[in-house]
Amino acid sequence: MKKETKVLFIILCVLLCCYALSFLHRPSRAGVFSSSLMHEPDVREIAEIRFSIPTRAEPVEMGEMTLIKDGARFYLRTGNGSYPVRQEIIDRFFSLLGAGRSFLPISARPQDYPDYQIDDGHASRIVFVRKDKTVLSELFFGMTDAAGAGRYVRTGTSVKVFLIDNAFEPFLTVAAPFWLDLQIYAALFRGTGIQGLEYGNHSVIRTEANSDAFRALESFLEKFSCIDIYSAPPLQSPQTARVRLALGNGTELRFSFTPLQSGDYVFFDSRSANAYLISGYTCEQLLRHIEAIN
């Protein structure tokens, strides 16, 4: 064997030994334990959820949102409305809260909190409250780890910081479109249909001749989707358009839409005090279907 080959062989052996030894001396995950963020009995007692979520980095701005349980459902309450939360979202959220997961202890020193963005000024904070207004749990979610697969977390009853999986990321938001079903008429025409329409000076009764146009309007409204809620006081102007629909079950639906400078429209209906935002394009399509009926 040539001298150069022997040297390369020796170097290769040394590197292989170092590689093997690196596995023997890798930092251990000592202290890892399995638990859940909340116990199942506590999850069942949740009657109110208060969110404080960073919506902008430096300078940090916090977005606030409160979900309140009324009967079997949770609602997003604003000063001018009460919006039902999607049940499948709540079910998934509560399932994650009570699920077993691995906790890796990271720090027990509050002075380390800024390193994980888990201090009060940067963390996403969620408070769970009972019906009697006592606090069940308070959770603080910090930044993700370097790989993006884990997230730092602490509870309000402990100074310890843990690393858990990042399954909660989608829920760290106060964006209404995530929590609410904005297809507000998806189930309206189950078992009934539109029998009459009034729009401005335009008044039409459903007949065999225009039945297809009415059916097209029903189909459009079933897929009709708002882009957000409108939490300001009711808005009316000379440009507000109003529509009345007479339904086959003896009820009626009244709605109005008012243009904003942004190009979107504020949308109200008679079923509740809730107000929504719809896009200019959606409003154009709605008017097209209404005006096609004669």
Question: Could you tell me what each predicted segment is?
Answer:
Residues 1-294:
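Secondary-structure "cap/kink" motif recognition
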